[in-house]
Amino acid sequence: MEMFLVAVGFYGIGVLTMLLPHGMQRAAHWLANSAALFGSAVCAYAAGLQLFGGVSPAPLTWGSYSLGCDGWSAVFLLLTGIAGVVTSLYALGYARSYEGSRLRLLGGMWCLFIMSMVLVLLAGDAFSFLLFWEIMAVASFMLVNHESEKRATWNAAYQYLVMTSVGTAAIMIAFLLTGSASEGFSFAAMSKNTLDGSWQHLVFVCAFAGFALKAGLVPLHVWLPKAHPAAPCHVSALMSGVMLKIALYGFGRFMFSFLPAWNYWWCVVVLLAGVVSAFLGVLYAQMETDIKRVLAYSSVENMGVIFAAFGCGMLMKASDSSFYMLGFVATLVHAFNHSIMKVLMFMCAGSIMHGTGSKNLELFGGLARKMPYTAVFAFVGSLALAAIPLTNGFTGEWLVLQSFISLGTSCAGQDIRLWTAVSFIMLGFTGALALGCFVRFFGITFLGRARSEIVEHAHESDKFMLAAMGVASVLVVACGLYPLPVVRAALLALGMPVALDAFGMNLAWAGIGTAVCYKPLLLLALLLVLGALLWLSVKDCFIVEDVTWNCGTYPTQRQQYSATGFSKPVRRAFDYLLKPKRQVTYMRKEHAYFGRQLSYKLEIPDMITEKLYQPLQKHFVSISNFLRRLQQGSVRLYVAYVMVAMMLVLVWGALYK
């Protein structure tokens, strides 16, 4: 525990940089981000020691409050530490673009944000958890609202604050109900609660609603595509890579420790919420032209996949299947891998914005010639998010699909097989859409010809940003080629034995035999051999290079696929879900042979926002307007309100004493 406290001490030093004089902004920037980097490195090392070295730190208690670390929290602390190191290194270069714009506040809040996430994972009681959870919410709100002079940023930040407050209220109710049926509010005491059936259902609903909101599951995701693009890119990377996973940690803590006897419908709700979130998330990501909103909706998709795997594990355990641990292993492996690849892609998005001054896909094209290193790193991240074999994205999603296969084959019952078939089909659609989404993302951005002048003036990022993206890219490839450490960490976190070999992994349980076998290094060797044979077969072929016939015209950049045009087949196929709003304006006729010019405007409204949240907002506004009539400014009227309230309380007490 001492090493975790050292990490918290580093973060505390970074927080104090907010107090430095205004003239020391640059020094505050370097000190805060360096402190975050070293603190995250210590955190990752301490978590790794606990997971792989068998070192179990003694819990730290004072009064009714406690800090501790077990296997479930250690794997998330490892994830937080690694992501914190990479993003803090990136921030050393990227955050300098905010010099003169509250740079001290940015660095201090950055350290407070990471520190609060670490303390949430170390919390050993409900009150400590909720305290650090609220600090995490406030720090992330301040970071999202850093450019508060922009109206869109202000709106996104306050919508995030309102939504996260609602989620916190639900989590608080779940803790209070569980603690009231226990001998205390420590996690150890709450694990021995005496909740009966109906109260267990209520605790599950509150806990799932609160953590699903923080994780960005549909239909509670509406804050995420607005808050992540509004925040600075290194903040977006950590919010998507780590903060969303802490919601998974909290939900898992409730399910494993406080509600170990799972009801069948709980499992179905978690599974379906994950599957629907995955499908709708990637569908909307395919439609976006803002690079950060693409990645934000991709986070909705991947959190959906993660919760679907968790629901699959729950359903197998509730059905007494021997393979239930496979779902939870897939959950942790994909959560860890998604954290690394999403951190990488948000950093690449920041590099693109830093080099071009824009985040509009429609203005890019040919950036690989101006930003070659960023292009390579974005290519690696795109392969991973598209779940291409030999990347870490494939490892996690492959395990998820294997867990669903095990669900369908090891559990009896037509209803379970129905859920399995529906989930498998929707996850298949999700994978295909994710592939198309990131082919579009990389191709439109880095390939082809420049679509605007901003590409001509683009420049590569500085050494800190490139180094951070390089480290993340290496981790993506390394965890794809050699997934053993990640899988082993997941199994150790779940308290399960593991059978691994030097070339891949064999997940086995007593009495079952090998459940899953995957050997990426052998697959790589096979691909290299096939590639060499292909090269030998074509190296002596006669190749003619010539200009393609262009119908007598010189092609321009406007004749390339646009981001909107690339996604049109998908948009047409799911028109009934997306409800696109098109506006076509015809201009005057400029040339006799080429006809009129036209202006095409497309808007894809969020279906959940339009059908659910906007009507709710109207009702709340109506109620608020009615309540305003009660505020007349009269002291005598307010005294009368108090008297009426007291009378009602007395009557209630007399009737129900």
What is each stretch, according to the model?
Residues 134:
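Short phosphate-coordinating micro-motif centered on Lys-Gly-acidic
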Residues 34-47, 165-173, 378-390, 468-488:
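Hydrophobic alpha-helical membrane-insertion segments
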Residues 1-6, 13-108, 184-194, 492, ...:
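Transmembrane helix-loop-helix hairpins at membrane boundaries of multipass inner-membrane proteins
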Residues 15-18, 89, 529-537, 649-655:
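Alpha-helical transmembrane segments
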Residues 58-61, 188-192, 399-413, 486-512:
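Membrane-interfacial helical/loop segments at transmembrane boundaries in membrane proteins
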Residues 86-129, 139-460:
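Hydrophobic transmembrane alpha-helices and their helix-loop junctions in integral membrane proteins
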Residues 486-520, 536-657:
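Aromatic-capped, Gly/Pro-kinked transmembrane alpha-helices
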Residues 69-81, 199-211, 415-431, 506-529:
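Hydrophobic alpha-helical transmembrane segments
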